[in-house]
Amino acid sequence: MIDKALLEIQDNIRYNPDRWNEIKHKADGLNSHFQEVIDNKRRSKDRMIHFAAFVSNDAMYGMDAVFSLMMARKDRWDCKVVIIPDVSRGYPHQRDTYIRCREYFAAHYGDDYVVDGWDMEADEYIDVMDDYDIIYFANPYDSMAVKVHSIQYAVTRNVLPVYVNYGYDVGYKTMYARMKGPELNYVWKYFTETIYSYEEIRKLQIINGANVSLTGYTKMDDYSRVNGKTKSRKKILIASHHTVKMDELPLSCFMMYHELILSLPKMFPDIDFVFRPHPLLFIRMINDNVWTKNMVDDYLSKIKKAGIEYSNGGEYFSLFSECDAIINDCGSFTLEWLFTGKPGCFVLNDKLSDEHITTQMKEGIKRYSIAHTNDDIVAFIRDIDADNYSKKQEMDEWVRNNIAINYPNAANVILEEMDILQ
């Protein structure tokens, strides 16, 4: 099955100065349009800012802390989550992720805060753009959405589109592709996370960072308010990335260590293990013909039988708080885990080179123990089992100064920047 988002990435990577000039010309023209939208709002008698988060996957959502602040300021903000379908990976994935996403946000915020962007029974996509003043797009790829849920459609309406990363930018080629596509050059405001990402956006983006604000990584604000469960046993988080077959960003080593995972509970009976794969890992393995659905189901059955906790979607900061260490080959998890101050093992794909990853990812990996083989992973776990690691559990000065910008108040910074009625 063709992955439309991956095709968009590959298309954007191609050298195409004529297309880039067209995007720049349109982006430059949007400045006056956005100012007109703001002026119209200020001239209106409506003193509420109507805000929507367009979300297709609950695990790819970077606005929770901001949304929570809005919920507490009902005198200024009327906020909703609009569930939109991911149409890029086939109907079963579209249906299942939509249902799961809707259920998650209804439970998380309450059903009154959730709006449907898809009538599943009638199979009709619902245009709600004109109901809002500002729309946050959790997904930076229009190829994953239908037209009425896209950024390129939003800029033709009386609305201000904004973007916040749902994860740290770690893949250089994927970041480059987003910088050369229309979506993030067209948004009114693009809130970014670190000085590294800010500088790379200014260097790579077609409009050279004209719409970018360095605000910090709002997603991690929530971590400061999480209290883990009291426990008597050590717990290790295993996080596997989805890039099993992706030359643009060869992070995943899942095919190297997937059998090892199943054997860990017997090897280390005094440690609990949690398996938290990227939400796209198994769907991509199926679509790329790496595994069949039956093979995926069989593996997950073995995970359960081995006594490994399977974490599938939703928030994960409680896991960060509860776990004593992480084994991962992921992207943003690599940087997010640094907020905990706890030990980590990064499983390094031998195909990964500096040209594949962003500066902040390169710097983040340096803070990890590196595993090249299954034996290296086992050695790391032995150290955790034997208490051969620091117990400080707090971020160091480098993380605070370079990665955790405005932590734990990045959400307040973003909220202030979006308040067009000030």
What are these regions (language model features)?
Residues N294, K342-D387:
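Nucleotide-sugar donor-binding patch of glycosyltransferase catalytic domains
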Residues M1-D3, N374-Q422:
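C-terminal amphipathic helix plus adjacent low-complexity
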Residues V162, N312-H356:
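A donor-sugar binding/catalytic signature common to diverse glycosyltransferases
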Residues A52-D222:
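Active-site and donor-binding regions of nucleotide-sugar-utilizing enzymes
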